């Protein structure tokens, strides 16, 4: 007689980028083992790949392509899956901002951590009186490729490739040019034609992108100085 199956609960959350409600389950022991091995390797690319694999396994809603999700969706999803799997509170050690050396232990409820949106963020960029550009968010795969693949290309080249991959279309009142219809080289050459003011608008798009963020107040036990600390990005919430 085969052993019985263990029932796994399902939970719901709303993806920050699309507002789509999806269903997910906690990760299993075999998936936790995969994550532990990746974390022990201290290899950022391996950790990110493990996170993506676990998320794929845990999402039960059909049609969700993890590879295409923005980085902040991936981070938010994983944080919630982790919370339902091993506990919704995480213990961290934060270095006191006032002296830069004293560790402060804190407990953070994962339910309080949200993706924060900047009011100044805009996916559309005006290049001149007639020409505009619409951006799209970098996927996790693009983020990995441009940050953790070290080849002969310079950092500047990788940055331009990342930006080029995040341009969705260029348009005016009469015509639309989809970047899916042209080569990456052509898009990079288009970027290189921009002046400094135009390029700064692209930088602003990335700087104001939605991000996983949590603000808390800490008190240095030695100096009694109270400080405000902002934690951003998934790595900030690993104990």
Where do the model's predicted regions map?
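Long C-terminal interaction/binding lobes of large macromolecular proteins
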Residues: 1-239
